[in-house]
Amino acid sequence: MPYYICNTCGVQHAQTVDPPNSCLICEDERQYIHPDGQTWTTLEDMREKGNLQNILKKEEEHLYSIKTEPEFAIGQTAHLIQHKGFNVLWDCMTYLDQKTIDQINELGGIQAIALSHPHYYSTQVEWAEAFQAPIYIHEDDKEWVTRPSNHIHFWSGETLNMKPGLDLYRLGGHFKGGAVLHWSKGNEGKGCLLTGDIITVAADRNWVSFMYSYPNLIPLPASKVEEIAAKVKPLQFNRLYNAFSKVVKENADESVQRSAVRYIKALNSELFHT
């Protein structure tokens, strides 16, 4: 039986004879059902079509971005961190083929997979099986897992130390279990924060933003944004990578704090009067 994949969000579902009637991810107000209706594919069909490829790009020393071209579903970018012989795949993407597996194995493989939130669960189990790697998801997002697996480990609390210098932090916001990855050795020791879109980079790369639903433009409350900013304030990070190939290259920690203040002012009618 096939593992069907939603064409809109790219998340793979449990094995069924026929396509599911609906997609749990897309029916939620943080995603959307395509105007043309719910459609499905499989990883096998995607490979057979032969029109997709994954592009690995070196972003900085020991950090690679991975993106599918042409864009599929949400179109997110995953990241591979090389950390003292322990490689972490941060967030995931739907398309996986042998070429990608070979390229990543040349870089040392994958020893762990960590997810920011359910929109990027994609074919995480396929990746875990290909590299025999555990998947780390915060327990607050357990209900959104559409393909269960023994590879999945649900972590609890506010932080998870994967290895010295690699830590997951639960920030919530976009999803209750929404997490970011702090890589203290990144950016030549100045620190990197990989955020998915728990914190996203704005069009002006000196600013970031926060949302409950990006496609449906539902903001987060001021109290939650204030809480997110407070949680990352003690962390040292000069650079921030989001899930869509946008980067705050310098002073990212200051950008987050400054952006949170602006966001809260906007919600409280203190930023502008139009």
Swiss-Prot record:
SMART domains with a match to the protein in the record: Lactamase_B
SUPFAM superfamilies, A to Z: Metallo-hydrolase/oxidoreductase (SSF56281)
Name under which the protein is recorded: Uncharacterized protein YmaE
